[in-house]
Swiss-Prot record:
InterPro entries: SUN1-5 (IPR045119), SUN_dom (IPR012919). One of its GO terms (biological process) is embryo development ending in birth or egg hatching. The keyword Zinc does not apply. Residues 7-47, 248-257 have a biased composition (Polar residues). The SUN domain may play a role in nuclear anchoring. It is a single-pass membrane protein. It comes from the Eukaryota. Residues 279-443 form the SUN domain. This is Sun domain-containing protein 1. The gene is sun-1.
Length: 473
């Protein structure tokens, strides 16, 4: 029988057998085999022909099954191809088995749902059967629970005893609180009763004080009248007696007499109400901007942050030190002063630092004084005009020089004045005022501007004291 070899020398992994040709062992082509494959059905009587069998009919009339692996391996593949195909068949067989196992043992979603429902149904049946079975044994367990409760009876008794003790303590505390509250209520009632009595006594004392105040005011008015009468009588009797004694002073110029808008020598006409010691102050919002009394760029620059020296212009003192003054660079310098009391003005004065012979530079030379009728002196009334501060020829250097205010019968009381400096000595750009004074007779403030006090007696008493001081002066 001739051998069959593949046309290609390479191994073939195809499932269908390759095309072959008959070759002899010596390499000579053999004639085509006359055997032909025949396909036939098993046609035995009584059998079902469900399969088709293929047979190979050789020349010697022997039949070989074409479906057998032996025929395929022997007739169509070489030895090497057969061994390689066997190896591949082993791997294919293993893969096939794994797939079969997965198909059989790995459930699908439908199988999983059916299994889950079966498990849940089984669990429900088990629970129902267990409840039915162990229902009778529940009473026995209650007996065991009673035995366990008996063991904890002593501890329960202790717990209840502690609770009862706490309740007793709370009740005792409540009783103490009630007792203390009752005691405090009684004390409060007693205090209220005493306070009512104290209020009544205080009201009576206030009434007595008001009566005393009225008596004191009447007495003061009588004393004022007596003093005025005494002054008038003294002046009448003293003028003819002192006429010859005043002969040496006849050489004084007529400007030295006490007349309006003229300089006087020394005249104390009332109380200085422009004194910071009794409450007077500078109204900076309506005054010129203050600067340092010292000259220099540094002091001018620091004056923007405050000089702290301008208050000396209202500090009534005997000795004036250099530098303790209110100064400004304004050409029309204005100094607004809030007086300590409402007064009827009689005179004003100015005093510079100690000088001799010549008035120092920066000192005011010519100034006016007006009475402010509103808060910032936009409305005003003239008091003194053209008041001059200067040296005297051949006479004593007066450090404080006065200017009297003309007397007006219906002059209203004032508490704001403004000094308007028009000229200074030396024609310097800076004007410095060391000490200004405003003399007058303190009076009661107007009714529309009278401040309310605690008991209505403070302002009257203060005014009475100031009046008495002015009269004694």
């Amino acid at each position: 029988m001739a051998l069959r070899h593949t046309i290609s020398p390479q191994f073939s992994n195809r499932h269908s057998p390759p095309v072959t040709r008959s070759v002899s062992r010596t390499g000579v082509h053999q004639p085509l085999d006359t055997s032909t494959p025949v396909t036939r059905r098993d046609s035995q009587p009584g059998t079902i022909t469900g399969t088709i069998q293929r047979f190979h009919e050789s020349a010697d009339d022997s039949e070989i099954d074409l479906n057998s692996s032996k025929f395929i391996y022997k007739e169509h593949f070489s030895y090497k191809e057969i061994t390689s195909m066997k190896k591949e068949m082993w791997y294919d067989w293993l893969e096939y088995r794994i797939r079969m196992v997965r198909r059989r043992f790995v459930p699908t979603w439908a199988q999983f749902k059916r299994t889950l429902m079966a498990v849940v149904l089984f669990a429900m049946l088990y629970k129902y059967a267990r409840d039915c079975l162990f229902d009778g044994t529940h009473h026995n367990s209650e007996g065991s629970y009673a035995d366990k409760d008996a063991n904890w009876a002593s501890e329960k008794q202790k717990f209840h005893q502690t609770i009862s003790n706490l309740r007793a303590e709370f009740s005792a505390h409540d009783k103490q609180l009630d007792f203390k509250t009752d005691h405090l209520e009684k004390l409060l009632e007693n205090v209220l009763e005493h306070s009512k009595g104290w209020k009544e006594s205080a009201i009576e004392e206030l009434k007595q004080i008001k009566l005393w105040q009225a008596e004191i005011s009447d007495a003061l008015q009588q004393m004022k009248k007596e003093i005025d009468d005494a002054k008038s009588t003294k002046i009448i009797h003293s003028t003819p007696e002192k006429a010859p004694e005043t002969a040496p002073t006849a050489s004084l110029p007529p400007s030295s007499q006490l007349q309006p808008m003229h300089i006087t020598r020394r005249a104390l006409l009332g109380v200085n109400v422009a004194n910071s010691l009794i409450g007077a102050s500078i109204d900076h919002s309506c005054s010129s901007r203050p600067v340092s009394a010292k000259d220099g760029f540094f002091y001018d620059f620091m004056s923007y942050f405050g000089t702290f020296q301008e208050g000396y212009a209202l500090l009534d003192r005997d000795v004036l030190s250099p530098g303790e003054a209110w100064c400004t660079y304004d050409k029309r310098a204005t100094l607004t002063v809030k007086l300590a009391r409402f007064v009827i003005p009689k005179s004003v004065s100015y005093q510079h630092v100690r000088w001799s012979g010549i008035v120092p530079n920066h000192a005011p030379k010519l100034y006016d004084v007006v009475a402010c009728t509103d808060s910032c002196c936009t409305k005003w009334q003239p008091l003194v005009a053209n008041c001059e501060y200067k040296e005297r020829d051949g006479s004593y250097d007066e450090q404080e020089q006065f200017c009297s205010v003309p007397t007006i019968q219906n002059h209203s009381p004032i508490n704001h004045v403004q000094f308007r400096f028009r000229e200074n000595h030396g024609d310097m750009p800076k004007t410095c005022a060391y000490l200004i004074r405003v003399y007058g007779e303190p009076v009661d403030p107007p009714k529309e501007t009278q401040p309310m006090t605690d008991n209505g007696t403070e302002s009257k008493l203060e005014s009475a004291i100031v009046n008495s001081v002015s009269e004694t002066a």
